Structures are given as C-alpha cells and as structure tokens.
C-alpha cells in the first residue's frame, strides 16, 4: 500500500499528463456518441490495447465540458494497489481535482475486487467511465460483477476510413491522383494496421511486434 503522499504525487503526475493530451489533435470516432454521460450505468469501453479507448473517453468528457477525475491503473507505481486502497485513491482525487461527478478509471480491471468499489460509486450517484483490455472484462464477468449497472462500448483500431481522415487522404474523389493516393494509403494500412499510435511513429514493425506480445501476455 502506498502512503497518501506518494499516491498524491502519482495522481498529480497523471493529471499533468492529462493536460498535455488535451492539446493533441484527435479523430472523433462514432463510438464516442455511444458513451452516455447522463446514465446511472457505468460506461465500459472495451478493446485491445492501444486501440484508443482512453482517448475516446477523454474526448467524450471534454466535448461536453464535464468536470472529472482520472486514474490510470496501468501505471507501474500503482501495481500493488488493492481494492481496500481505492478509497484512499478517491480521497486524493478530491484533493487534486476538487469536487467532481465523473470518475474515469483507466484499466481498473488490474485490481482484484475492483467491481466492489465501482458499485459503491454508482450507489453514490457517481458517473463512472471504465476502460479495459483483457479477459477480466468479458461481458459475462461484467454482468456478474456490476449486476446490470453497466453499458459496454466495444472499440476497435481505426477503420480504413478513419485512417484516411487522420492522414488527410481524400476518401471521395475519383481523379487519377486521388485514387492513386488512396490506394497507396490502403497499402500502408494493410501493412501496419489501424492502431492510432502508428500514425505518429516512424517505424512500425517493432511496435506491432511488441504490441502483439503485450496483448497475448495480458
């Protein structure tokens, strides 16, 4: 268990990272509209690692100007957090963010018994947004753990259309030049896939290799 001073430092670091991400140019995806921020159910975005789950949730919250607190449990400094520590996490979040009605829990499935905390938050009328990327967030488990108090939103890597939007490739033009650019983009898409981070890094082979290994290990 971390003492509250260390916990505050970690969560403050994460808040700082969140501020940096607010300045990024992002692609608004159709799944964003599926996140019902007015619902009393937990909104659970599920997908493979690096498919853009966190970004999708950030965009939904920022778009409507909701005041929220954020925790990324996929942080090595929080590796030993237990379910009984989550109230301390909540206390520190109130200290950092002030009052809030939306709680964004990134990869909370890493914590055994996480659903007990989430259920308590829902009973307190807290709006909860969750992301997850492994077998611990299977539909059957969610139905059991959250007793119907959740809405699942599946998310996949970019479609070719979304890939084109991010790469500023014309998806409608029919001139020889436009079609040639579109075919070239499709060739790249087939080779590297639609993981969002691949659009901003130069070398993709090691990224994909490491990502596949990471997904299989999880």
Short names for language-model regions:
Residues 49-50:
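Walker A (P-loop) phosphate-binding loop of P-loop NTPases
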Residues 54:
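Walker A/P-loop
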Residues 127-133, 154, 163:
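Structural recognition of the conserved hydrophobic beta-strand(s) that form the central parallel beta-sheet
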Residues 69-102:
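Short glycine-rich substrate-engagement loop in P-loop NTPases that contacts/grips substrate
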Residues 2-18, 162-218:
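Interdomain hinge/linker elements that couple catalytic modules in large macromolecular machines
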Residues 1-39:
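A short, basic N-terminal segment
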Residues 45:
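Hydrophobic anchor at the beta1->P-loop junction of P-loop NTPases
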Residues 136-152, 166-168:
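Short regulatory helix/loop adjacent to the ATP-binding pocket of P-loop NTPases
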